[in-house]
Structures are given as C-alpha cells and as structure tokens.
Amino acid sequence: MVEINNLTKRYGNITAVNNLSFTVSKNEILGFLGPNGAGKTTTMNMITGCLPPTSGTIIVNGFDISKNPMEAKKSIGYLPEIPPLYTDMKVYEYLKFVAGLKSVPRSQRNEQIRDAMDRLKISDVSKRLIKNLSKGYKQRVGFAQALLGNPEILILDEPTVGLDPNQILEVRKLI
C-alpha cells in the first residue's frame, strides 16, 4: 500500500530525512519514533504529497505520489500535527465541506459525516463553531475529517495531542 524507496529531504545543507526505505502493507500499522527534529513529520508530509522529496520514490496504492499525486492522495486520510481547521465554521459544516473536497458522493456525505462524528465522539458539538472548542475536540474534528471518504491509508501525526487520558484510549482503540 505504501512503498518508500531511498527517500531523502534536504533543506540547504541540512538533511532532514536521509535515504529512508520501508514498506507498509494492507492492515499494518507503522509508527515513527524519534526525538524532535528526526524527520518524522517531514516524512509524513512527503508521503501525503504536501512536501516534495529531494530524491527517492513514494508509491501509494500503486501510484507514484510525484507522477500521479491526485490518484495517490485519493487513498490517504491525513491528520497533520496541527489540523488545518476552518475555525469560523461549525463542526458539521466543516466536515461537509471536507467531504465535498474529497468528492464523497452527495448521497453518502451525511452518513459518512455522522459515522465519523460518532466514532470520534464529537456529535454533541456538531453545531458549535470550531473556534469555541477545546484543543481535544479540535483534534478529534481533525481526525474525523481524515476518515471521510473511507481512505485505505491513514497517516496520523501526533493524533492524541491535546486529548485527555480517556480520549487517548478511545483513539488508540479506533486506530
């Protein structure tokens, strides 16, 4: 599903990721561990097509992310470290907007949104403005948007940041 070959990212003289190779098959979970600045987020940004590599290849569901980015991205649900939320939107409106961006068929949007909100336990705040939510709720809204479209691949950067201990357990179960 994800194949990384000789992936490198340099910023001038600084090498953030150096010759990284790995494969993740269907139903596998892979976690990156390392200190701050080790290249974990940089690697995830390259896999999702948000950041071009200096060299190497990234194959997502059979598509090279640099040659067929739109096809590769259709398979990915991404929760960045800081979710890019439109804070002046209500939770449900935002998720509906994202579902449209992800080309979720109109006939399936409401069901997928309800399912994602139920799974992340955010249904009770669906009519609230995102800017008025706690950090934990904002994180869960970001996670919910990653689930829309039923992606085959989830890439989650620090998915439990800002969550309380019970929420952390729930998210780990979901993963």
Question: What does each model-found stretch correspond to?
Answer:
Residues 129-133:
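Conserved ABC ATPase signature
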Residues 35-39:
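Walker A (P-loop) phosphate-binding loop of ABC-type ATPase nucleotide-binding domains
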Residues 154-158:
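Catalytic Walker B motif of ABC-type/P-loop ATPase nucleotide-binding domains
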Residues 148-152:
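A short, proline-enriched helix->beta-strand linker immediately N-terminal to the Walker B motif
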Residues 143:
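Hydrophobic anchor residue at the start of the ABC signature
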Residues 56-67, 71-76:
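Conserved ABC transporter NBD signature motif
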